[in-house]
A protein has these predicted regions:
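Cyclic-nucleotide recognition modules
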Residues: 69-125
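Short phosphate-coordinating micro-motif centered on Lys-Gly-acidic
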Residues: 36-41
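Polybasic "coupling" helices that flank or enter modular domains
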Residues: 97-99, 115-180
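Short alpha-helix-to-loop micro-motif enriched in aromatics/charged/Gly
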Residues: 61-68
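Cyclic nucleotide-binding regulatory module and flanking cytosolic helices
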Residues: 1-31, 71, 76, 81-85
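Glycine- and acidic-residue-biased ligand/ion/polar-headgroup-sensing regions
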Residues: 33, 44-57, 72-74
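Phosphate-/nucleic-acid-contacting segments
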Residues: 147, 156-219
Length: 219
């Protein structure tokens, strides 16, 4: 499938705008673990995911990561083109969680179309509002929800995404997603194991009591 099949508002663009986007959209393939954009890069461009999975995260002064959101097929990343938004200074890192194919559109190209199209401008604002809502929700979870509940919710989300109850994931990776230390994750996972909710092995977490994790997450 080509670019036009993935861009959500393609049919609302003028033929000229469609030609500009198609001509300037560069298809790029990256391996799992590749850092596509980080806060020190001036402007990577707008990203449109064709297949795979991307993770957006921030780094603390101590180098600790915390995931903000993830991007899947047909999702668009604007923060990698933050130079389009003069009032937003957001040092964010975008990393491939899986082998990913995506289109990269230069900020200049997209900004040109956004300035002449109210449809594109409104669409962009909707994406921005959604991302900020996700970040605000995450901050509320970190501030007000206990870690055991957050971890239960994370494990259930991973099971849903990977479509399996046996997660191939390390404690270090979980810690990076959740913005905490590996030791904290390990202690809580061992508690979950003692309670019969999970089974731990090297590099894997098996969900044994999905219902109990859901109840814990919901309380």
């Amino acid at each position: 499938m080509d670019f036009s099949s993935y861009f959500p508002i393609w049919n609302k663009l003028t033929p000229t705008q469609q030609q500009i986007l198609e001509r300037n959209a560069v298809l790029r393939k990256v391996d799992k673990g590749t850092v596509i954009h980080n806060g020190t890069v001036e402007c990577t461009g707008l990203l449109l995911v064709r297949s795979g999975q991307l993770r957006a995260y921030i780094l603390s002064d101590e180098g600790r990561e915390i995931s903000l959101y993830r991007l899947f097929d047909r999702d668009i990343c604007l923060f990698s083109a933050s130079c389009m938004m003069n009032s937003i200074q957001f040092e964010i890192t975008i990393e491939a969680q899986k082998d990913t194919t995506m289109w990269v559109i230069s900020a200049d190209t997209y900004q040109h179309i956004m300035k002449e199209s109210a449809v594109v401008a409104n669409f962009t604002n909707e994406i921005m509002a959604t991302r900020f809502s996700e970040v605000m929700w995450l901050m509320e979870q970190i501030m007000w929800k206990s870690f055991d509940k957050r971890l239960a919710e994370f494990l259930l989300e991973e099971c849903s995404l990977e479509e399996t109850n046996i997660l191939k994931i390390t404690h270090e990776t979980i810690a990076s997603h959740m913005g905490t230390a590996r030791e904290v994750v390990t202690r809580m996972l061992r508690y979950f194991q003692n309670e019969g909710m999970v089974k731990l092995a090297r590099g894997t977490v098996e969900i044994c009591e999905e219902r109990r994790l859901q109840e814990l997450s919901d309380t």
